[in-house]
Amino acid sequence: PFGPGHSWVKARFIDPAPRGTVLRDTQVVFNPQTKREEEITLTRVAIHGSYRENPYLDPVYVATLENITNPARRKAWLEGDWDIPAGGAIEDVWDTDVHVMRPFDIPENWTITRSFDWGSSHPFSVGWWAISDGTPLPDGRRFPRKTQFRIAEMYGWNGKANEGCRMLSSDVAAEIKRREAEYFPHRHVVPGPADNAIWNQDDGRSIADSMAEKGVVWTRSDKSRGSRKLGLEELRRLLQNAKDNTGPGLYVFDVCKHWIRTVPTLPRDSKDPDDVDSISEDHAYDDTRYQILNK
């Protein structure tokens, strides 16, 4: 437990069943040996182990663990406790009950825009955002001007954590156009910020060029020196504002499953705690960072 893979391992092995319970997943696959479709069962199990069971463990190492100052890390590594905060970058300002909302009709005079983090072997992430101008909702709820709502998303993965679907950029753009026609009929979607890497030229052609041919254009994101840290601080500020109801905040519609799955548990960088760990599944976070730093 603890570290970049904490949330994935916990969701995969720890949460589904008590320790020692064998989980079985059955699927039908083609067997090259028999030339038939057959049921294959995959198994997985979480088995608790303790350092006390290892007679060869150096007691100096145990003393080192007992002197860890971070109580969550100490409990994780000494007791094998998975039900601890895993060093999340926003865990202290995130509250699912506050920040995750059921979708509502976007007022006509609110701005709708989108942000984009490109990926091929790793996931890409498109986020659609509604920005409040202070106009109340039909049910009377009112949010401060410039409050941002992540209202929809498109996440390019293959079903495995942090693995992309290798979708062509032109096909991504075509799907964006299709979804915008479905999600926001008769509304204008303002082009928003994207990963600046999409403007890199390859044989005179860029990903941005391919997407523009399909009618999807972007603005450049702020990737200036220090922007990663500024982005994290701005996200924390917006989430805290939403909790305290003290100013423009940030909320996420409950249909944005990948944002909810990946962003609240993103760990801090162990070498630079003012940033998130960039080897984690941070793609929805990155498109969010581009959006909230967009001026």
What positions do the PLM features span?
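Mg2+-dependent endonuclease catalytic cores in nucleic-acid-processing enzymes, primarily RNase H-like
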Residues: 139-277
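Acidic, Mg2+-coordinating catalytic module of metal-dependent nucleases/exonucleases
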Residues: 275-295
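Short loop/turn segments immediately following beta-strands, especially the blade-tip
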Residues: 18-19, 131-136
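Hydrophobic/aromatic beta-strand patches that form the interior of the parallel beta-sheet core
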Residues: 45-47, 114, 193
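Short beta-strand scaffold segments in enzyme catalytic cores
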Residues: 124-130, 289
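ASCE P-loop NTPase helicase motor core
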Residues: 1-54
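ATPase catalytic-site recognition across NTP-hydrolyzing enzymes
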Residues: 50-118
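Short acidic/glycine-rich loop or secondary-structure boundary segments that cap or lie
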Residues: 56-58, 86-87, 103, 122-124, ...
